[in-house]
Design a protein with these regions (language model features):
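Intrinsic-disorder/low-complexity, polar/charged segments
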Residues: 54, 93, 153-157
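Short, low-complexity, polar/charged sequence segments that are solvent-exposed and flexible
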Residues: 68-72, 86-88, 107-109, 126-130, ...
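Glycine-rich loops and low-complexity Gly/Arg-rich segments
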Residues: 32-33, 74-77, 92-94, 111-116, ...
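Adenine nucleotide phosphate-binding catalytic loops in nucleotide-utilizing enzymes
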Residues: 112-179
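Phosphate-binding loop of NTP-binding sites
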Residues: 1-89, 95-103
Length: 179
């Protein structure tokens, strides 16, 4: 059975900092098919990830996907998300959190609050220690219990690192696979 993980990066498609970081981190373990503004690019080797950068999200048409809201994004949302999806969002994004609140969808918040699903406990110029605060069920239906893990700081945006870590946990690419 061929299984493709679909990931939408919601927000301005001209801001490619998140997609560049995600692709760079995943390309050694996954085949990534990247779609953005008519551009199609494929890199890497391994299980398939479809990475779509899009400003307009027609949520009722998306099924079994991860929707990652970019920092400071204003995606054009249409409809309610289906419960089989997962949203990864900054806890500082109050506007979009309000739009998805009350929907029966797994929401993973990322930020510096102890209430966030994914946060960090320490940070320096080279490493950020990321923390999963609550259990997440991966796409393989494996319960991933809270844990901490140091990650090399390969980008300057802490939210991109936290969102990548959340996605990694969701797709089963966790502590056994060095990030």
């Amino acid at each position: 059975m061929i299984y493709i993980i679909t990931v939408f990066l919601a927000g301005n498609p001209d801001d490619s900092s998140m997609s560049a970081y995600f692709m760079d981190r995943l390309k050694n373990n996954f085949t990534i098919t990247y779609l953005n503004n008519g551009l199609v690019r494929q890199i890497g080797k391994g299980p398939e990830i479809l990475l779509i950068e899009e400003e307009k999200i027609i949520s009722e048409n998306i099924n079994n996907a991860v929707i990652v809201f970019k920092r400071d994004c204003t995606p054009l949302l249409s409809g309610k998300f289906l419960k089989e999806n997962t949203v990864i969002i900054s806890s500082y994004d109050k506007s979009n959190l309000k739009k998805i609140s009350g929907q029966n969808i797994e929401t993973i918040t990322c930020g510096s609050s102890p209430k966030d699903t994914v946060t960090y406990s320490s940070s320096d110029d080279e490493t950020i220690v990321v923390s999963l605060q609550r259990e997440i069920t991966s796409f393989t239906n494996k319960a991933v219990l809270p844990f901490e893990m140091p990650i090399k700081r390969l980008c300057d945006d802490d939210y991109n690192i936290l969102a990548f870590f959340a996605l990694s946990v969701k797709i089963g690419f966790t502590e056994k696979n060095s990030l």
